[in-house]
C-alpha cells in the first residue's frame, strides 16, 4: 500500500493514535469486548481510513467476548479473524466506491445475480474450474448479499458468508480479487477444490447451504464502511 505520514486517530476512545508518524502498511486495530451477549453478533469489521486510491490504511475488528468459547468449540475462531480481515482490506466493502467519487465498480449485474468483474479474480475463478463470471452472493440479508462470494457456488471458500466445519481455504480467487482492488498481493492461495464446470452468474437455481454443518457468519457480523480519506505522500 502507499506510504502515509501523519496522525490517524484510534477507533477506540482514549487510546493512542492508530498512526502517529509514517506507515507503509495496513494498520488493523482489534478489540475483544462485550457486544450483545452469546449467540448474536460475533463481530464488526471494516476499513476505517482509506488512501485516496481506496486501499485500506487503517481498519478495525471487534469480537464479542461472549461468543469466543463457542467459536473455539467449533474450531472456527481463526477463520473468523481472517474472514473479517478480508472485509477490512476491502472484500465486499471497497468493491464499489463510486458513491465516494472514486471510479471503481468491481461488482456488477443486478442485485438478483451480481458478479465480480475484476480480471485477476476471474482468471483464478476460471482456472479453478468456474464458468462465466465470478459470482457474488445474491441471497440473505444486508450483511450477506453483495458483500461475499456466492455460497451456492463456492461452498467452503473463506470469503463466502458461511463458514463450514473443517477447512475454509483462502483461495487464489480471493487473492486475485485483492490485486483487482490494487494491492500488490501474491497470487498464491490455500488448496481449494472447486469442481470443474461450477456455474457462475449464468445459473438459474442455487443450492441451499446446510446451516447444520457450519456457521452463517454473514448473519452474525456487522460490516463497517470507511469513515475517512487520506492523501498519500
List the model feature ranges, each with a label.
Residues 1-82, 88-233:
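Extracellular zinc-dependent metalloprotease catalytic-domain scaffold
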